[in-house]
Amino acid sequence: YHDAVNGAGMGVHGSITYDIGEMFAFKRSVSEKLRSGIHALLKGAKVDVIEGTAQIAAPGAVDVTGADGAVTRYTAAYILAATGSVNVRPPIPGLELPGVMTSDELLEGADTPYQSIVIIGGGVIGVEFAAFFSQLGCRVTLVEGMANLLPQLDRELGQNLAQILKKQGVEVLTSAMVQSVEQTAGGLCVRLEQKGKELAVTGERVLCAIGRRAYFDGLFAAD
């Protein structure tokens, strides 16, 4: 889309639009095909797939509650917990406001394009969404508390990526700590502190992409 819109210099002319709702619908259809393919691979490998909510009840024992509420116990010499992860929402005032989303919520899809978005967190998820939305013509502000983007990786990589994003029109703010998010008449206002100075950036939406944690909620029996 970005190349087509900006293709006049290469002799590409014409009017082009996008439907973000259809884009997310396509994303969901691809994900569903991948899930179906994985199920087929597991079936071919003679792996029993049991649907339900699991809880480790005792060493070597897992209770699974099915959709009908019935509980079935399964036993094994070893148990591997591969329950995935969930988004982290730190205790920052305003992160509970409407329009503040996690990456999971954002991936559920949007009906209308966003004109502007503030992304809190310059890790892998935040950088990916910054690149995605900037290519769609959205005004993007990317906020990272550490000195560089992708702080878990080599410093040079984060610095180079910041330059690439800036060339795409992304406003990159590093060493910037979010103090609060407020609802205003023009959208959402994110108040920051950067090297002793107070800043404020605004957006139609705010994406909280600070990180994820392992999901173990309810996995272990209380006793």
PLM feature spans:
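Residues at the starts of beta-strands that form the adenosine-phosphate
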Residues: 116, 138-141, 171
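Gly/Ala-rich phosphate-binding loop of Rossmann-like dinucleotide-binding domains
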Residues: 130, 134-135
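Core beta-strand elements of the Rossmann-like FAD/NAD(P) dinucleotide-binding domain
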Residues: 69-78, 196-205, 216
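N-terminal Rossmann-fold NAD(P) dinucleotide-binding loop
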Residues: 126-127
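Flavin (primarily FAD) binding-site architecture
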Residues: 82-95, 209-223
